[in-house]
Amino acid sequence: MTSKAVVFAYHDIGCTGIEALLNAGYEIAAVFTHADDPRENTFYASVARLCAERGIPLHAPEDVNHPLWLERIRQLRPDFLFSFYYRRLLGAELLACAARGAYNLHGSLLPRYRGRAPANWVLVNGETQTGVTLHRMIERADAGPILAQQAVAIDPEDTALSLHGKLRKAAGALLRDSLPLLALGVLPEVEQDESQASHFGRRTPADGLLDWHRPARQLYDLVRAVTQPYPGAFCQVGEQKLIVWSAEVVAGNHGREPGSVLSCDPLRIACGEDSLVLRFGQRGERGLYLAGTQLATELGLVEGARLRGAASGPQRRTRVLILGVNGFIGNHLSERLLRDGRYEVHGMDIGSDAIERLKADPHFHFVEGDIGIHSEWLEYHVKKCDVILPLVAIATPIEYTRNPLRVFELDFEENLRIVRYCVKYGKRVVFPSTSEVYGMCQDPDFDEDRSNLVVGPINKQRWIYSVSKQLLDRVIWAYGQQGLRFTLFRPFNWMGPRLDRLDSARIGSSRAITQLILHLVEGTPIRLVDGGAQKRCFTDVDDGIEALARIIDNRDGRCDGQIVNIGNPDNEASIRQLGEELLRQFEAHPLRAQFPPFAGFREVESRSFYGDGYQDVAHRKPSIDNARRLLDWQPTIELRETIGKTLDFFLHEALREREAQA
């Protein structure tokens, strides 16, 4: 009997998977893929074209986990689901649609290199072997039982592109041998060894920055991991960007400082250990592909000159002052900037539990203090630093009604003082506005430059946060007309690890997801304010921080005088839906047995929860056209993945609390 499959595929390995299924006698009822991104270098084969040529029904929905698509897939009655380099997570309900199971082909030898871009990461890390793995899909990404693996040797001269070709061939061979056995039901499964698991996140173009203090072999590995068709490794020559496409390691560095030009023919650069010959590269994003010797001539390099990369070169790092550095945005942003290698971070906050992991970094400088008290330190560091981020704010709804004057004093008055220091010393300010400034705007998508900012009556004190932020936005804009360099960014419901503390949720002073998780942890009913019908667009903190880092980088000054929404309009969900997805992942979590039974959902009125001064809004959805245009940024992380990371963080925090109390 023919096995029926629904396939989720992209990339040329997606094509390899589809061809293998057809050759093994599977019936493909439908293929789901992605529309090509015009900003991406699509060097790979087209799943869409293959399906058109083979007469296979093809779909490319934004959300394959949407109930409408779930129902359509159920109606196909598939025996199997297969994912071949599909870029979105398949939810539990979708996985359950397959009568005989759902299977994924992953580009590493699991459990090592779970996550994104494994072919790039193995090269960056200098591995000599990788491979492909066929495994059963469970709700946790890349964590299901293994059915088959095929190893691939990594040669010293392999690039990401050549390695991808090897992986494609290995995938074809593995599927050729495995798919017939899977159809017969005789392919055994082996659980993954969690003690050997490693996980790697997505890579960004900024990760290609060359740090000349590192050994030449590590830089060579970075170059080949991100060379064409990827964005490339790079460094700075004065104000010009030098992209390196090909390099080779040469023994010795003549005892010269890292980043020093040892010769121009060939173009040879001293590293922390040995040296690197830059064989081919280009000047800037639109330059010609040139040999290293010609690049040296065109860039005006001479022996003894210094190239600037991470932690090297004569030009100092950009100094970023983050006030509220221990907060959710502050600690994630600090980590991102320090990883970049071009920044020195100075921070103040009243605590440091979330930044303990950063304190050992020599480019991270922290002082415990209060911006309302330590005014001399504050003014000195505004004068000293290049970019100022005043992130200190009271930003939880219950405090808007419980302590409206404190919200005004901190969120407006204290931050106004910082803005005036920036004016006084001519410093650039990147100010955190808020999605709350849009208030009860009726536009379907909130636009930074056109949407009206609408709030409720004076007796609804919940709007004091919104109007405090809006007033500061207007003051900053007015100072901008007098020469202040600024960017306003508006986060839309960012979520992720270290969002809040469970103790904050216990007194009601936390974000919605933390409140919901606390109820699960303590076995109390999940309270849905006014039924939880309010919709928000939730944004993964990694996506949000990447956009914010690009604002700080401010390439070509394009963010000066701009307002930028940072949110994920594709991740719209009601609070009830958020709670339901949390519950599903909670019940499937490995730590589930450590917590009490689920106590159900309970609907409560907003007045009883927040007090008389509260007023809610039905939806809050951003337009992100400005972010796309100014930052070349697009959020990519799905809500299910963000919920999973956030839940996992708080469950482990709850166990740590329990151990500390024992």
From Swiss-Prot:
Positions annotated to bind NAD(+): 349, 370-371
Alphabetically list the UniProt keywords: Antibiotic resistance, Lipid A biosynthesis, Lipid biosynthesis, Lipid metabolism, Lipopolysaccharide biosynthesis, Multifunctional enzyme, NAD, Oxidoreductase, Transferase
Q: Provide the site residues for: Transition state stabilizer.
A: 104
Q: Which GO terms describe its molecular function?
A: carboxy-lyase activity; UDP-4-amino-4-deoxy-L-arabinose formyltransferase activity; UDP-glucuronate dehydrogenase activity
Segments of this protein annotated with the region Formyltransferase ArnAFT: 1-307
Q: Which InterPro entries match?
A: Arna-like_SDR_e, Bifun_polymyxin_resist_ArnA, Epimerase_deHydtase, Formyl_trans_C, Formyl_transf_N, Formyl_transf_N_sf, Formyl_transferase-like_C_sf, Lipid_A_modif_metabolic_enz
Q: Which residues form the active site?
A: 106, 436, 620
Catalytically driven reaction(s): UDP-alpha-D-glucuronate + NAD(+) = UDP-beta-L-threo-pentopyranos-4-ulose + CO2 + NADH; UDP-4-amino-4-deoxy-beta-L-arabinose + (6R)-10-formyltetrahydrofolate = UDP-4-deoxy-4-formamido-beta-L-arabinose + (6S)-5,6,7,8-tetrahydrofolate + H(+)
Q: Which GO terms describe its biological process?
A: lipid A biosynthetic process; lipopolysaccharide biosynthetic process; response to antibiotic
Gene Ontology CC terms, in alphabetical order: membrane
Q: Which family does it belong to?
A: In the N-terminal section; belongs to the Fmt family. UDP-L-Ara4N formyltransferase subfamily. In the C-terminal section; belongs to the NAD(P)-dependent epimerase/dehydratase family. UDP-glucuronic acid decarboxylase subfamily.
Its name, as the record gives it, is Bifunctional polymyxin resistance protein ArnA
Lineage at the top is: Bacteria, Pseudomonadati, Pseudomonadota, Gammaproteobacteria, Pseudomonadales
